């Protein structure tokens, strides 16, 4: 089990080092104009008012670009997003990523009942079942890793995070490099997923 945890951590490090050359450039002002149709779901500044839809504000440009490209190519599927991304050019994708990454993420909050288990899963994982610590890839403050395209989770809607973790677990979502997320969550229980989703939503570090 310990070897599995080290394997995931090593995979994160190796992928980060091999992805360091990935650069996302774009025009935030042009992205703001392109983003107008996105506002109905993702909010005026990328802070979605609905927990069903993700906050895009403050998310890493590298991650945003990859997700839009994956929706466009079919590597990630969602009825709404696949349709929205289909007509985006590479320039549109870069501009949208630049715009949303330049916005400020609205902080979340963690209900008290999820703190203990959520913190344990995030910082330590579950040694008995072989679930690795989320912190190994997403960082101590859930800020993610832009060089490796690991997303920022801090401030994200707990409901959205929970949905994505369960989608990885079931295999419905499969656009994670080297199956890292599918491997990490496959032995997580519903209770663990719910707790860690709420925990990271409220986790933040002083800038």
Task: Give the role of each language-model region.
Residues 2-21:
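Gram-negative bacterial Sec-dependent N-terminal signal peptides
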Residues 18-35, 49-52, 102-128, 207:
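Electrostatic cytochrome c docking/interface patches
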Residues 21, 102, 117-124, 135, ...:
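Predominantly soluble domains enriched in secretory-pathway, periplasmic, or organellar proteins
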Residues 26-73:
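The feature marks the first
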Residues 49-55, 70-113, 146-152, 169-195, ...:
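Axial heme c-ligation environment in periplasmic c-type cytochrome domains
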Residues 31, 38-45, 96, 131-140, ...:
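The canonical Cys-X-X-Cys-His
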